[in-house]
Amino acid sequence: MKLRLLSGALCTAVALGFAHPALSAEKAQDFVNKAAEGGIFEVESSKIVQGKVKDQAVNDFAQKMITDHGAANAKLQSIAGEQKLEIPAEMDAMHKSDLEALKSANGSADQSYVKMQQDAHADAVKLFQDYAADGDNAELKAFAQQTLPTLKMHQEMIEKIASG
């Protein structure tokens, strides 16, 4: 009886050991998916509003998003490639819908863009904080830790613009 119980426990432990790398890959891939979709959205939405916004601070912020998130996106793509993870080919439906709303905005898109960037940066900061703390891939975890201060700075900038 004890031998049967021990054998069952050992089989379960071995099975869980083999299952763990798959769980890790899924978690890393999930981070890559969300980080890439968010990063692409921040660049593309910023490109759309340049010239459509009236507030110079918003325009300057949009340019910074193109530069900073463009660089972060390239670094993420490089790390993902090295780690054999895939970058999503396109954004999710919500981000696509937000881009369409910006494209079709009549007149100034300041308020819509600022709100979208507030939401995007709140999501990004949480995603990167969580992965920096509990990430399962050392390279991606380091990327999250290195990128987080910039995301927090962006979040502070957009909150200041929104309140001003």
Model region roles, listed by residue range:
Residues 2-164:
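His/Met- and acidic-residue-enriched segments that coordinate or traffic transition-metal cofactors
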